[in-house]
Every structure is written in structure tokens, then in C-alpha cells.
Design a protein with these regions (language model features):
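A short hydrophobic beta-strand segment most commonly corresponding to one strand
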Residues: 104-106, 147-158
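Non-heme Fe(II)/2-oxoglutarate
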Residues: 1-72
């Protein structure tokens, strides 16, 4: 059900992906919620693909990740950036799509934030690790306390 692969992308290629996404000129956009309108969290987001369209000039940067997943059809590709907090706490269980597809989370940097599934399984945020699971499996990210930011690439696909 949940599959985990470490060093998912060739390490030399991953260095470039990380450098681009975590670079000071990468366009992140403030989002006043994390899970749903009115929650107490915020994050910065970047849509690479949404509503059947490539929405970012940076799509080519993450294309090798998409190719390696053997995607037949994309639903959404989004980068999430959260900032350091004073204690680790979950954001809230949720699903990313209102229908059954696949979800993959690629961790762009290592930090002490985790992904928790409704099954109780916990996945550490370690760079270049990917976790793949059915989109109807509820999950939550958490805050982190050790790095300035936590960055993940969230991919929903068939």
C-alpha cells in the first residue's frame, strides 16, 4: 500500500532539482491555510501542474521525477514550503484528491518533520526520498523545528 524509495532521483540530478526549488529566486506563493480554509496554519506553494495545464516554467526541473514515476496522466503537481516552528505538531489528516488516484511525496530537504498516515505509519523527511500511496489514504504532514524550511513535492497522478 505505502511504498518508500530512498535516493529516488539520480543524486547528481537531485542536486540540481534541490538547488532550483530551494534557490532564492524560486517563486513561492503565500497560502493562508495548509489543509482547508480557516485552519491555523499557512504555507508557501508553487503549482507546477494544475487543471490539465503546466503552470510553471520550472516544470522542466521536476520532469525527471514525473518520468521516473511512469505517470500516465497528471492530476496536480505542487511544491509545499513550510517554515520552522517551536514544536512538532500535525496539520490534520486529509486526502489530496476527491477521487482515487495515486499520490507521491518527494522530500526536497531533510528535516525533523514527518508524514503520518491514518494507519499510524510515520515517514521521516529525508531528501530525495519518495513515498507513494493511494490517494484515498488519509495523511498529514507536521511542522518541523530544526531547519528554516521543509520543502516537499506533492504529485497526484494516474
Amino acid at each position: 500500500m505505502i511504498k518508500i524509495k530512498e535516493n529516488f532521483v539520480d543524486p547528481f540530478l537531485f542536486v540540481d532539482i534541490k538547488k532550483q526549488i530551494m534557490g532564492k529566486y524560486f517563486p513561492w506563493f503565500y497560502n493562508d491555510c495548509k489543509i482547508e480554509e480557516g485552519d491555523e496554519h499557512f504555507q508557501f506553494i508553487h503549482f507546477f501542474y494544475k487543471d490539465n495545464l503546466v503552470t510553471s516554467d520550472y516544470f522542466k526541473v521536476i520532469k525527471p521525477v514525473i518520468d521516473k514515476l511512469n505517470v500516465k496522466s497528471l492530476v496536480r503537481v505542487k511544491g509545499n514550503l513550510t517554515t520552522k516552528d517551536i514544536k512538532i505538531k500535525p496539520f490534520g489528516l486529509h486526502t489530496d484528491a476527491p477521487f482515487k488516484c495515486k499520490t507521491a511525496i518527494l522530500y526536497i530537504n531533510t528535516n525533523n518533520g514527518i508524514t503520518i498516515f491514518e494507519t499510524g505509519e510515520e515517514i521521516k523527511s529525508e531528501e530525495n526520498k519518495i513515498v507513494m500511496y493511494p490517494s484515498n489514504l488519509k495523511h498529514t504532514g507536521t511542522t518541523h523545528t530544526d531547519e528554516k524550511v521543509r520543502v516537499v513535492l506533492n504529485i497526484n497522478y494516474f
